[in-house]
Amino acid sequence: MSQGDDNPAIDPKTADAAETVTIGRHVVFSHGKESGPWGRKISSLVEVARSEGYEAHSVDYRGLDDPRQRVARLAQFCKELAGDLVLVGSSLGGYVAVASASLLHARGVFLMAPALYMPGLPELREGVLDCPATLVHGWRDDVVPFEHSIRFARTHRAALHLLESDHNLHNQIRVIQYLFEYFLIALDLPALAFE
């Protein structure tokens, strides 16, 4: 779904099998449980993605609380995309991005206060991620403990940035834009950029 489109990303019940595949470089955003597909963080990162030569898409998960249904919706949406795929997720959207990354052969994942290792969510198997990852989390997050991002970063050798912020990270959007830009640039560099 492109910015400004009010329809759900792709409804598997009504998806047209004859739709064309879009080839290129794609960033696909997954929003959190309490937000929408064009919330403040996502909207602020769209221009960064476009400036680095990516098409920006945001999947609408409103009304889907089950993370397995969200993963299925993301997989269905990404069937229409070919080429480089970068997944970006915030909160529950971060969980969805991680759970989908290997299946979708993502080139990288960028996670903001991801809901990892949370009670009530299906457990992710260790080592589930096979691409570069960067995590951004707020020290004062009272929804998802920042320690969960530390654990994930340690396990997956991912970059981690802990910022003076809370769960929504709104006071750090400019910093997150810079971190996201660096992440996208580094994906085009030799492997040393993530080691």
Spans of model-derived segments:
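Short, surface-exposed "cap/lid" segments of acyl-processing enzymes
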Residues: S2-L64
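Acidic catalytic loop of the alpha/beta-hydrolase fold
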Residues: S35-G36, W139-V144, N168
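Short alpha-helix in the alpha/beta-hydrolase fold that links the catalytic acid
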Residues: I42, P145-A153
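Gly/Ala-rich beta-loop-alpha elbow adjacent to hydrolase catalytic centers
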Residues: V88-A97
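A conserved short beta-strand
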Residues: H105-Y117
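Short beta-strand/loop motif that positions the catalytic acidic residue
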Residues: V128-L129, L135-H137, D141
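Catalytic histidine neighborhood in serine/cysteine hydrolases
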Residues: R154-L169
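Post-His helix in hydrolase/transferase enzymes
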Residues: H170-A186
